Amino acid sequence: MRRDFAKKLYDAMEKDTRIFLITADLGYGVLDDIRRDFPKRAINIGSSEMLMVGIAVGLAQSGYIPLCYSITPFLLYRPFELIRNYMNYEKANVKLVGSGRDDDYAHDGISHWAGDDMHVMSTLKNIKLYKPRDITDKVFTDFMYNDKPSYINLSR
């Protein structure tokens, strides 16, 4: 599912220069083509998830379409204050992409579990949620181009 998403994201970034990818030291292999071909719009900020979401909020407020990509629990729980305040209340149009669902990364310990992401995110009523079985063109297009802050969860 991640590879399908990355291919669709690559195609979208070719056509739309407003799209930025910000990753927190994740996506090696899957996102390498994007990093290579769009170096000014593909940013790896290291393991600094609050910074990642903060940068994305600034880009969204400047008219860009920022996409944050990381392992689901790190993407959501570390920067939750910014997600709640800026995405949910201020409606900054940031796109969150969580890699891994349920126990996809359980072998790395409880900090990597992602079984409650949809429950937690459902408390933020202004963020559109997606948990697709596969990445169709319709799902991808709706996720990227709806005018609401959004979260999508991708299985490994």
Where are the model-predicted features located?
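Thiamine diphosphate
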Residues: M1-R156
